[in-house]
Amino acid sequence: MEKTFPMTQEGLDKLKLELENLKLVKRPEVIDRIKVARSYGDLSENSEYEAAKDEQAFIEGRISTVETMIRYAEIVDNAKIAKDEVALGKNVTFVEVGETDEESYQIVGTAEADPFSGKISNESPIARVLIGKKVGDIVNVPLPVGEMTVKIVKVD
């Protein structure tokens, strides 16, 4: 059985848009660049040709990866999860015990994780600890050096 890719509907929609862009925009652009580079003649010392071929390989690899993620996407349905329970697709807000600054993240599948946008992978150490916990729970979150104790203050 193939590996499934748990994700939100939003994550799946973004992958579909990325795939469309790769196939309808990026792929034709790089094919055109290869044609232009070929017209320069000798390919053995043609850096533009080599760069375009490298980009083509990257694009084709990404298309394959995205198609696989879409094919085996498992959309998360939180209807059966308690409203105050941390789960994939939900936003969780917590505060380090003894501090006042809150941190909020959405827990998403690995395919859509982007920590800079506040989206952390369900496979990350912090998400693994938080998933299944509820508002008011106090948990120890592993850090590269040591750990921190946090209290879950909000789940939505």
Curated annotation (Swiss-Prot):
GO molecular function terms listed in the Swiss-Prot or TrEMBL record: DNA binding; RNA polymerase binding
Keyword line: Coiled coil, DNA-binding, Transcription, Transcription regulation
InterPro entries: GreA/GreB_C_sf, TF_GreA/GreB_CS, Tscrpt_elong_fac_GreA, Tscrpt_elong_fac_GreA/B, Tscrpt_elong_fac_GreA/B_C, Tscrpt_elong_fac_GreA/B_fam, Tscrpt_elong_fac_GreA/B_N, Tscrpt_elong_fac_GreA/B_N_sf
GO biological process: DNA-templated transcription elongation; regulation of DNA-templated transcription elongation
Disulfide bonds: none
Domain of life: Bacteria
SUPFAM superfamilies cross-referenced by the UniProt entry: FKBP-like (SSF54534), GreA transcript cleavage protein, N-terminal domain (SSF46557)
Coiled-coil region list: 7-27
Assigned protein family: Belongs to the GreA/GreB family.
Its job: Necessary for efficient RNA polymerase transcription elongation past template-encoded arresting sites. The arresting sites in DNA have the property of trapping a certain fraction of elongating RNA polymerases that pass through, resulting in locked ternary complexes. Cleavage of the nascent transcript by cleavage factors such as GreA or GreB allows the resumption of elongation from the new 3'terminus. GreA releases sequences of 2 to 3 nucleotides.
Protein's UniProt name: Transcription elongation factor GreA
Organism, as annotated: Lactococcus lactis subsp. lactis (strain IL1403) (Streptococcus lactis)
Gene symbol of the encoding locus: greA
